[in-house]
Amino acid sequence: MASLVPTRPIVIDTREQTPWTFPDGIKTVRRGIHFGDYTLDGLDEIVAIERKSAMDMIGCVGQSRSRFEKHLYGLADLPFAHVIIECSMRALCETCSKTGVNVSSLVGTIIAWQAATGVHFWTPDDRRFATALAVRILFHSEKKWDQKLAQVGVGQNTPLHLVGEPTRLLSEAVDEYRGGSTLPPR
């Protein structure tokens, strides 16, 4: 069975204060990323994962909401965009209750954000599971993107800014992948 890890190095944003530790054999690099905390080398404009702790996520619904929403709509421009909250939904709701934030508001906001932007929100049980989930997300995003490149006759190592005419075809493929939906105005 083939290994389910990406072939490109995983890029960890330099602002990430408590980065995930990936298993041996997975190459990583640290550098600044425009959107998200994790991506793949060369695919910054294709895939991103934003990592949040329970308290971070609760803050995003409250006092940091406008900043997070701006960031979320930037993520939504990518074909593969994800937010991984490092706890189960139950643990997130329990933490929310302890802070005085309305649980229904938190859950409703996350659902509304996902529906409005198409960004996937994940709630794995813990940090270890979150790390494993991130590896799988990056692997499958890379695989799907490489298939799209192959469909338009572009090699996976061709820098996107040098692609030329196939860029239009890739854009159409991304729109098709998203179901042709357009995002609401910002």
Where are these regions (language model features)?
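Conserved catalytic cores of phosphodiester-cleaving nucleases, focusing on short active-site segments
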Residues: 47-53
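Non-catalytic C-terminal interaction segments of nucleic acid-processing enzymes
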Residues: 1-45, 56-186
